[in-house]
């Protein structure tokens, strides 16, 4: 294109952006991603409805046929695409991490940068192109996100393995997710994420930039199986897997297929996002011989683990323990392992040439399962009990591919397993009539007469509901887990104060349920939210605005037995800008952490703004902190936060070296009038947030402020009410 310089958009596209001029500028774009403006299917599109109309049997049949329909442009190893599709599904799901719930297979992100071009995803572009005719045939009845996972399941089934089940319901997104922090590195395979004694930063799980899990050659390419085991344990734990699940996943996945390192890796071309336009989204074009089939280079490793690479067997463990292993190198120069003394020669088939046979081979991360004492014990048990291995792999694979979907109620289709699994955070089914409008009014009156403050009511409801994460659909008010371990003991929830509030609400619940007729009941989960609503209404009334906060009963109360304490521990907030809470060492600024929390709550910038302003004056700060409480009339739902923040009569100065907290002094008298954190002052400092704050600080904003606060509040209270959105 010769006239690129004449394009009116060229300068805008290539010129400096605000972020280039001001690298530290707070980025709010993550609060507005995945809008209808980027969705070609439109706001009215209902994926669940489309999926329910899908002929799933026909789709599965087509996928089975695809497995052995080898294409000349990318021939199937061993005549079967199953191993390639298992890797595709694994890598789609394997980006999930428990720290913030981000990543995973839930939105089909493997189609977009950076994931479509990660070194660890090399040649998975071919898998997606092989799938395209089937996706094209079934159209919008199956999302790419669901198709990735279902194809992985069918691949396993086609090679003789019985999977645990499949739940559909993953709706595609249409642009890269910008909210996920993949690491600080600016180069592929760098590992600046570590500090101290190999301590992994923040919520990160993978060991290097561009890897899904760990380096198969060992830490930083050093072939040390014991050190690799340490990396494996840390990384898989951060992806919600225990030792048994980890061994099962590694061994189960490596029962099939091979790795690819036929020759010099320097002959492999650039990734899809860096490829020429004529490549049409394909990358890693190789100049080594034919560049495909037996000449394929992907990881640089050339490993075939078993004698039956397209059939489920126990041969992975048989080979792992029947041979003694020595370090060698692949044709591409990568570290791998082969049996000592030439043992096993001729037992493994070649992927493309029937006249060739090989010895089995292993990765450093495979040898780790024999070297690490805990992994070795599990591996030997699986060797001796293949049925236990098959069950463990089936369950771990299901968990891997469904972990980011949230509760079982979100799963769609006839293949959903009936068994309730603890990691799905189950809540009891609703088995009683719920309260009506008359009951709601009576309950709110009792709550307001119970001697609890607006601050207590609002804080408790927020603490319960705001555990929700839009990333993996965990947390939220349903289940009333705020009364259970570990949430009842979290420092941010002020356990002593929380127990008093819950005791009062439990008393009201017991009284109502004991006197209600017709089997009608109110759950504590519902009552906590209703109490928060009552507090908001009372505070609005004090501000001169009559409002009814919408309330949808139907939540139920989970038991401690339904609550995995260790699993829920990762939901404990280390920060919540909405409550002006910050604990320990953080890797982001207070304002960045506020945006991070808002994004997990699926909030927009206007919703974030109005909620912070409202929660401050309602007294919802953790531990009763006065930071950001810019009002002389607390527990009144006024716009005082914005009015006083934008008051030019106040000058702000930091009071600590890290500039986390600030004093606001009267410019004339010099007296301290307010204190604040970065999560407060950002609404006056950041030009976009200040523009929003000005709306709510205006003299005509009283009604709008309350109305918008109630709408955003209700959204948060109902974030985990998936049945309301069905």
UniProtKB/Swiss-Prot annotation:
GO cellular component: cytosol
Pfam families the UniProt entry points to: peroxidase
Keyword Iron attached: yes
UniProt-annotated stretches for the region Disordered: 338-359
Site (Transition state stabilizer): 87
Cofactor notes: Binds 1 heme b (iron(II)-protoporphyrin IX) group per dimer.
Paired cysteines (S-S): none
Binding-site residues, heme b: 254
Subunit structure: Homodimer or homotetramer.
PANTHER family (alphabetical): CATALASE-PEROXIDASE, HYDROPEROXIDASE I, BIFUNCTIONAL CATALASE-PEROXIDASE
Name recorded for this polypeptide: Catalase-peroxidase
Lineage: Bacteria, Pseudomonadati, Pseudomonadota, Alphaproteobacteria, Hyphomicrobiales
């Amino acid at each position: 294109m010769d006239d690129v310089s004449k394009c009116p958009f060229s300068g805008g596209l290539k010129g400096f952006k605000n972020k280039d001029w001001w690298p530290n500028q707070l980025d709010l774009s993550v609060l507005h991603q995945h809008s209808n403006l980027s969705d070609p299917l439109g706001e009215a599109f209902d994926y669940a409805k489309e999926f329910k109309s899908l002929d799933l049997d026909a789709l599965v049949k087509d996928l089975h046929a695809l497995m052995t329909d080898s294409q000349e442009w990318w021939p199937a190893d061993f005549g079967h695409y199953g191993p390639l599709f298992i890797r595709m599904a694994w890598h789609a799901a394997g980006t999930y991490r428990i720290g913030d719930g981000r990543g995973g297979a839930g939105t089909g992100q493997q189609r977009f940068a950076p994931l479509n071009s990660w070194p660890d995803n090399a040649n998975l572009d071919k898998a997606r192109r092989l799938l395209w005719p089937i996706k094209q045939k079934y159209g919008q009845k199956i999302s790419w996100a669901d198709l990735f996972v279902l194809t992985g399941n069918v691949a396993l089934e086609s090679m003789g393995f019985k999977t645990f089940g499949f739940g559909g319901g993953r709706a595609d997104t249409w642009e890269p997710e910008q909210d996920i922090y993949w690491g600080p590195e600016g180069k592929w395979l760098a590992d600046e994420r570590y500090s101290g004694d190999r301590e992994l930063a923040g919520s990160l799980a993978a060991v290097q930039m561009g890897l899904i899990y760990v380096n198969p050659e060992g830490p930083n390419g050093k072939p040390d199986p014991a050190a690799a085991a340490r990396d494996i344990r840390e990384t898989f734990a951060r992806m919600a897997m225990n030792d048994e699940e980890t061994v099962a996943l590694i061994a189960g996945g490596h029962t099939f297929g091979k790795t690819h390192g036929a020759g010099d890796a320097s002959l492999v071309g650039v990734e899809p996002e860096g490829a020429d336009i004529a490549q049409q989204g394909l990358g890693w074009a190789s100049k080594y011989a034919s560049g495909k089939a037996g000449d394929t280079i992907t990881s640089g490793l050339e490993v075939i683990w078993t004698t039956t690479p397209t059939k489920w067997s126990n041969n992975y463990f048989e080979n792992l323990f029947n041979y003694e292993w020595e370090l060698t190198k692949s044709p591409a120069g990568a570290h791998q392992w082969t049996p000592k003394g030439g043992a096993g020669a001729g037992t493994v088939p070649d992927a493309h040439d029937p006249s060739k046979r090989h010895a089995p081979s292993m990765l450093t991360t495979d040898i780790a399962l024999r070297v690490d004492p805990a992994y070795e014990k599990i591996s030997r048990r699986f060797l001796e009990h293949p049925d236990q291995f098959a069950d463990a792999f089936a369950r771990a694979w299901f968990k891997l591919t469904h972990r980011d979907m949230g509760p079982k109620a979100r799963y769609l289709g006839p293949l959903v397993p009936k068994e309730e699994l603890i990691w799905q955070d189950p809540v009891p089914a609703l088995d009683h009539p719920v309260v009506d409008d008359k009951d709601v009014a009576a309950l709110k009156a009792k709550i307001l007469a119970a001697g609890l403050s607006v601050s207590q009511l609002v804080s408790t409801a927020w603490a319960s509901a705001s555990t929700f994460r839009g990333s993996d659909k965990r947390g939220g008010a349903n289940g009333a887990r705020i009364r259970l371990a570990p949430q009842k003991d979290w420092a941010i929830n002020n356990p002593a104060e929380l127990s008093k509030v819950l005791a009062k609400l439990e008393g009201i619940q017991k009284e109502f349920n004991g006197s209600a007729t017709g089997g009608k009941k109110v759950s504590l989960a519902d009552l906590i939210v209703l109490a928060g609503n009552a507090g908001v209404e009372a505070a609005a009334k004090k501000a001169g605005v009559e409002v009814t906060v919408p309330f949808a009963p139907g939540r139920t109360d989970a038991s401690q037995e339904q609550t995995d304490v260790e699993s829920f521990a990762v939901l404990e907030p280390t920060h919540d800008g909405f409550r002006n809470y910050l604990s320990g060492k953080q890797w982001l600024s207070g304002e960045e952490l506020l945006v991070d929390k808002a994004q997990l709550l699926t909030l927009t910038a206007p919703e974030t703004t109005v909620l912070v302003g409202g929660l401050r004056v309602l007294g919802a700060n953790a531990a009763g902190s006065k930071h950001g409480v810019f009002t002389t009339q607390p527990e009144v739902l006024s716009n005082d936060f914005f009015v006083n923040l934008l008051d030019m009569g106040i000058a702000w100065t930091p009071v600590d070296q890290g500039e986390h907290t600030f004093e606001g002094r009267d410019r004339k008298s010099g007296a301290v009038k307010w204190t604040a954190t970065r999560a407060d002052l950002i609404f006056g400092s950041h030009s976009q947030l200040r523009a929003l704050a000005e709306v709510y600080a205006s003299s005509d904003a009283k009604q709008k402020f309350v109305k918008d606060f109630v709408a955003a509040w209700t959204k948060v209270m109902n974030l985990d009410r998936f049945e309301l959105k069905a």
